[in-house]
C-alpha cells in the first residue's frame, strides 16, 4: 500500500498492463481516484476465533518490505462468503474498494476496531437509487485545470454498510469503485444512458437453478503472455453475467462480464 501522500496513481505500475488506468488528473472535487497495489506477501495463521468486524471502522499499520510503517483507516464493508478470510474495505480518502485478508496478511499490523460507528443516513431519493442500479452511465470528473472529463461506466449496486454510496465500475478501468452517485446526479455530473437493449430478461422456469461462477478459480492471460490467477467472489444481482474477481497478486476488486459460452 502507498500512503495518500505518496506517489500519484500515474506514477505507479498496475498489475494488469492491458487496462487503461486512472490518470492522476482525473479528480473529483471531493475526492480522487486513488489506488494502491502490491504483490502478495506472507500470511500469518489465525490463532483464535475473530469477532465480526463487518460494519466496523478500523485502523491498522502497513509495512511493505523495508519501507516505513504507514497508518490506514477505513470501513469494513463485507466479508466474502467464499473466502471468509477476505474482507472488502473502503479506506478513507480512496475511492476503490480493496480486498485484504486482514487477519492473515503479515504486512498488516496493530489492527484495531475503532469505537466510532458508521453513521446511518437516509437515502434522499429511493426511486432514483433503484432506477440507476444496473444502468450504463456517463460520470463526469473535474480535472486539475477545472475542465470536465467523462468516464463511461455501470452502476452495479448500493454499497453495503455505507448506504448512500454505490458500487460502480468503468470501461477505462474495470475495478470496483464507490461514490455517492445521487449527489453527483443532482449536481449534473452523472448521466444515466438510455437502455441499449429494451428486451426483458429471459424468463426462468419455476425452480430453475441458474449457474453461478462464484467460488470458481480463474486464470487471466495478460497481453505480455503472463498469467494471473484469482477467484470469482461475487455475482452482480442487477447484471448476472457480471462478476467481481479478486486476483491473487492484487488488492483491487476487478469487475468483468463473464458471458458463458459453450
Swiss-Prot record:
Keywords: Cell cycle, Nucleus. Its main location: nucleus. Residues 1-49 are annotated as: Disordered. Expressed predominantly in ovarian granulosa and thecal cell. GO terms for cellular component: nucleolus; PML body. It is found in: Nucleus. Pfam families: Spin-Ssty. The keyword Transcription does not apply. The keyword Nucleus applies. InterPro entries: SPIN/Ssty, SPIN/Ssty_sf. May play a role in mitosis. Belongs to the SPIN/STSY family. This is Spindlin-W.
Amino acid at each position: 500500500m502507498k500512503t495518500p501522500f505518496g506517489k500519484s496513481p500515474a506514477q505507479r505500475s498496475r498489475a494488469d498492463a492491458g487496462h487503461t488506468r486512472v490518470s492522476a488528473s482525473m479528480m473529483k472535487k471531493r475526492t480522487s481516484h486513488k489506488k494502491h497495489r502490491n504483490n502478495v506477501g506472507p500470511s500469518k495463521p489465525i490463532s483464535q476465533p475473530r469477532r465480526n468486524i463487518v460494519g466496523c471502522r478500523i485502523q491498522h499499520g502497513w509495512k511493505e518490505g523495508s519501507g516505513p510503517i504507514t497508518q490506514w483507516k477505513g470501513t469494513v464493508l463485507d466479508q466474502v462468503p467464499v473466502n471468509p478470510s477476505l474482507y472488502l474495505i473502503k479506506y478513507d480518502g480512496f475511492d476503490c474498494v480493496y480486498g485484504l485478508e486482514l487477519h492473515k496478511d503479515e504486512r498488516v499490523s496493530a489492527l484495531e476496531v475503532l469505537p466510532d460507528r458508521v453513521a446511518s443516513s437516509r437515502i434522499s431519493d429511493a426511486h432514483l437509487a433503484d432506477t440507476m442500479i444496473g444502468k450504463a452511465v456517463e460520470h463526469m470528473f473535474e480535472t486539475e485545470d477545472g475542465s470536465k472529463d467523462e468516464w463511461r461506466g455501470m452502476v452495479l449496486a448500493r454499497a453495503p454498510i455505507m448506504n448512500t454510496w454505490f458500487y460502480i465500475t468503468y470501461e477505462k478501468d474495470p475495478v470496483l469503485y464507490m461514490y455517492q452517485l445521487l449527489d453527483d446526479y443532482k449536481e449534473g455530473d452523472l448521466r444515466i444512458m438510455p437502455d441499449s437493449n429494451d428486451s426483458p430478461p429471459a424468463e426462468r422456469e419455476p425452480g430453475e437453478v441458474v449457474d453461478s461462477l462464484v467460488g470458481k478459480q480463474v486464470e487471466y492471460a495478460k497481453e505480455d503472455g503472463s498469467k494471473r490467477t484469482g477467484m470469482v467472489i461475487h455475482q452482480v444481482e442487477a447484471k448476472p453475467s457480471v462478476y467481481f474477481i479478486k486476483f491473487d497478486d492484487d488488492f483491487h476488486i476487478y469487475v468483468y462480464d463473464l458471458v458463458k459460452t459453450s
